[in-house]
């Protein structure tokens, strides 16, 4: 897995490439925490680019980041599908206040 950082005046983007597998999936969480430190009003976006595999731990990290308000941009059918399903799950969990 490779994570790179790009900055513009409106966005800070973390570009994730490769396989999002345990135990390295936690690196994405750590990279997001570090990237949030100095946003200066910019939006933090995670771009999933050429991601070929996502483990359960990887899905858990993505779901956690979605729940914290981070936006994802995805390339590829597989990655789009996984992030879309996790976004739906996050929306359902937010709507379920009975627990």
Task: Place the predicted regions along the sequence by residue.
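STAS-like cytosolic regulatory interaction modules
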Residues: 1-99
């Amino acid at each position: 897995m490779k994570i790179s950082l790009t900055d513009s005046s409106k966005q800070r983007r973390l570009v994730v490439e490769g396989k999002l597998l345990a135990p390295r999936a936690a690196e994405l969480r750590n990279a997001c925490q570090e990237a949030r430190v100095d946003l200066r009003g910019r939006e933090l976006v995670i771009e999933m680019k050429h991601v070929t595999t996502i483990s359960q731990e990887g899905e858990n990290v993505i779901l956690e980041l979605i729940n914290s308000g981070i936006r994802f941009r995805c390339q590829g059918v597989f990655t789009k599908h996984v992030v879309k399903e996790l976004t739906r799950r996050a929306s359902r969990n937010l709507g379920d206040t009975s627990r």
